[in-house]
């Protein structure tokens, strides 16, 4: 399990620009809006640095506030694909989705930043950056246990300061 100290130590590496910890569940059959079920979606439990580290920007509504990570606020950000598929042309902001029987209020819509071009050098990198689901839902990582009733392993993404630093950033982070 990653701790705040782990993240601090990773971010202090000279090769690292930022890092994020997250959990993920692919194809949950527990995501609804009204009577519409979303098949083949992916749910992410993210920390406050996820969007910046991975290259997302909020295009509608707002992103997570600090309190969303500490107060167990049941809020969600969805990607544009899910917004279009599940809400059928309506704005999702302010709507309530059901994840595993728990109501989450959608506060924003995210898209990949067009300036963000990851370097993909492994199969894991490909799956991290190339999403083929019918949509993504992001919830604060502290809400993961509310939705799935148990902890799952966290993943870590490290954003290097430049391409020359990628190998060392990854190796040094893995050693921590």
Can you name each region flagged by the protein language model?
Residues 9-16, 172-176:
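Generic non-transmembrane alpha-helical segments
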Residues 49-63, 74-176:
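Mid-to-C-terminal secondary-structure elements
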Residues 16-17, 41, 104:
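A structural micro-motif
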């Amino acid at each position: 399990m990653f701790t705040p100290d782990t993240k601090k130590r990773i971010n202090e590496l000279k090769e690292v620009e930022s890092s994020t910890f997250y959990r993920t569940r692919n194809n949950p059959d527990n995501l609804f809006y009204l009577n519409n079920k979303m098949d083949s979606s992916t749910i992410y439990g993210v920390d406050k640095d996820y969007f910046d580290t991975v290259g997302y920007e909020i295009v509608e509504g707002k992103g997570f506030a600090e309190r969303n990570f500490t107060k167990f606020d049941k809020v969600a950000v969805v990607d544009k694909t899910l917004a279009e598929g599940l809400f059928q042309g309506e704005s999702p902001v302010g709507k309530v989705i059901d994840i595993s029987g728990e109501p989450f209020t959608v506060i924003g819509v995210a898209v990949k930043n067009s300036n963000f071009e990851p370097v993909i050098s492994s199969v894991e990198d490909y799956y991290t950056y190339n999403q083929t689901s019918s949509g993504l839902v992001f919830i604060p990582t502290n809400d993961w246990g509310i939705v799935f009733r148990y902890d799952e392993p966290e993943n870590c993404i490290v954003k290097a300061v430049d391409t020359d630093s990628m190998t060392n950033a990854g190796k040094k982070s893995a050693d921590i």
